[in-house]
């Protein structure tokens, strides 16, 4: 059962990844006050309206060689990276719940975690593509993180009653991860990390619930960013030393949450 659930979540994640990538492009066009793409997916280069078999997550991209079926212009890597990232995130998170022993509260926590992951993935896609983090999506992610904290403490609420001490670990976690990126932002005056990065880090820290997990996420985010971005930063044609940390923070969130047990 668990293996089947893993595969199912991978497929669902790939579908959502394709959807999130499309929505990121639509939002960008609205912000730039360009003509909207419409309700149907089209090639951004020739305007070819994609058929249903052109929209199969992951499969279509590889079958077409990452190119438009009509004009053969390269589609780019954003689509396939979005689909693979969301698919793998959902598949990994499926291992955090045991379908045979899970209680209703466990399913609620799992559902909110998936919703938060979708919101964070959208932020990662948008930040990676355009270097910005939409305020509305940041706010929605923060709300999901708060709900997740409440659900995780629900059992303790019913046993011990309300206490501010119950919120101390997630608050410390958010302050630690968000605070460190805020310091980097202030020291560099926005040259190293963006204004939204420390907010995103704080939200992720809150959702991780533990200061120790925040430290692990901090290491994973910075290590992966250094590993991937170092060749670009060292290159002669570099435009900026500023790194978009959004994708790396979200990657660290999923990995930390998955292997926390």
Where are the regions that the model predicts?
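A membrane-topology feature that recognizes alpha-helical transmembrane segments
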Residues: 1-261
